[in-house]
Design a protein with these regions (language model features):
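Acidic, mature catalytic/reactive cores of soluble proteins
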Residues: 1-320
Length: 320
């Protein structure tokens, strides 16, 4: 396989078809590349679970990177029924990059190591479930002016790399809707199989879940909420864990997915004269990329596939 973040998870997707049990340890090692702010290291080290921040020390965040781990874990769960993997304790990656690549931790150096520590200097470990929640919730809150997830460095189409300030990927916002819904479903199955009504999560992550005061319609509010969380874990974290109801987590994930679904349907169904499709992107000027421009159709296949597969497109829209 390759040596990048997507390659790790997509290789596992293929290996799961042949040897699901053998992929478990591999996936847990991969989660050690996730930072507490939901971003991840992008260069793979020589040993399992070893990561390097970025090539040539150039900070870059791909907005789709948090999507692939859950997709892979979901297939593993379907293949094996081994929901105990969600309880597996895994460390987090730590380096100079903080606040989702927007700031630098000047107090960190290589002597501190590349594992997130708590205030007592102990390496902190969180469950695989905690890693998944952080990745997908942070993506939900990092939105552009049209309230879709920011494109940042690019999504899985690496050519879409010239819109770091105002670009948004509606296509992968659709993908994250699917993640949130399926993660909620997995949590409910986990609760039944493991007979666990609650899970332990870092107290910082508990605050990320408790967003009742956030107006989802307000992009600035969502970004401010995300920044407060990212700042709370940019150096050391408390190391304190709290019990959280599995049912409440699942309900919160569905609530976010429902809002995203309605928002995309309301704002991104474009076209004219009885022919419509979904816009999938905004460029660095904040303009819709797809639609009917001066009588010329602009449509990307990715946008249509992701809107259909995620369930954003309803039956009538899918027929169109």
């Amino acid at each position: 396989g390759g040596r990048g973040w997507r390659d790790l998870w997509q290789d596992c997707l293929a290996l799961l078809m042949m040897d699901p049990a053998g992929v478990r340890e591999m996936m847990c090692n991969h989660f050690a590349g996730v930072r507490m702010d939901g971003t991840n290291a992008t260069i793979i080290g020589a040993r399992p679970g070893e990561f390097i921040a970025d090539r040539n020390h150039i900070t870059r965040v791909w907005m789709d990177h948090a999507f692939w781990p859950f997709l892979t874990v979901r297939l593993y769960l379907d293949q094996t029924g081994d929901f105990s993997i969600l309880d597996e304790a895994v460390p987090y990656f730590k380096d100079r990059q903080i606040v989702r690549g927007q700031e630098k931790d000047d107090e960190w150096n290589e002597h501190h190591g590349t594992r997130q520590q708590d205030r007592n200097g102990k390496v902190y470990e969180g469950s695989v479930l905690e890693h998944l929640l952080i990745q997908n919730l942070c993506a939900f809150y990092e939105v552009g002016e049209h309230n879709h997830i920011r494109l940042r460095g690019a999504d899985w189409n690496d050519a879409l790399d010239l819109a770091p300030e105002h670009g948004e990927s509606v296509a992968f916002t659709c993908a994250y809707v699917w993640n949130l819904r399926m993660l909620a479903e997995c949590l409910e199955t986990y609760q039944k199989r493991m007979q666990e009504p609650s899970v332990l999560l870092a107290e910082e992550v508990c605050r990320l879940l408790a967003d009742q005061s956030v107006d989802y319609e307000n992009a600035a509010e969502k970004n401010a909420f995300l920044k407060r969380y990212a700042v709370s874990c940019m150096c050391e974290i408390s190391g304190v864990k709290k019990e959280v109801s599995v049912t409440k987590i699942a309900e919160g994930l569905r609530r976010r997915a429902d809002w995203m679904t309605e928002h995309i349907r309301r704002t991104e169904w474009v076209g004219a004269e009885g022919e419509h499709w979904y816009n999938g992107y905004y460029d660095n000027h904040g303009r819709q990329v797809e639609g009917n421009a001066d009588g010329n159709v602009r449509m990307m296949l990715t946008s249509q596939v992701f809107s259909i597969m995620s369930g954003i497109a309803d039956e009538q829209q899918t027929m169109q």
